[in-house]
């Protein structure tokens, strides 16, 4: 039984290592919405032309972004930001763990969306994010933070993207 859990953990770790971006600077967290399922969220900042975007990627066993998702952010100073987005990609990875004569499937779904954000809204993120809600299926992803985990880091990623563009 001990080897069973070790095998499952190794397969899951390999799935996450294989699907995670290696060169992108991201900020993220893992969240268990229900007792049986959870998700891993990663956020990064990119600049395309003159627009800035927050790229959000969810890895889960069943959660996907809608075609036109919405991200609602509440800062620790009480400001509420609503960002409109669009689905830009998705996929799944499947593997199996062999236990005796049985194969236990392990599937991970990956869904990515981009949300347009202004420099003024990035300035508000410097106050820290206390709550984030993303419209997804089969249920919305909502996470409340007691202390900031992603707000200041997203703001710093914005400053890096801005400096990279200006220092060309």
Spans of features found by a protein language model:
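An ectodomain-focused feature that recognizes extracytoplasmic/extracellular
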Residues: 25-75
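Assembly/interface hotspot detector across virion components, adhesins/toxins, and nucleic-acid enzymes
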Residues: 19, 43-45, 129
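Short, surface-exposed beta-strand/loop "edge" segments at domain boundaries and coil↔beta transitions
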Residues: 37, 60-67, 79-81, 123, ...
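Internal interaction segment
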Residues: 89-90, 94-168
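A structural detector for beta-sheet-dominated domains
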Residues: 44-46, 57-59, 74-76, 84-86, ...
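Bacterial Sec-dependent N-terminal signal peptides
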Residues: 1-28
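Extended low-complexity, serine/threonine- and proline-enriched intrinsically disordered segments
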Residues: 67-95, 134-135
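Generic marker of residues within folded, mature protein domains
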Residues: 14, 46, 61-63, 73, ...
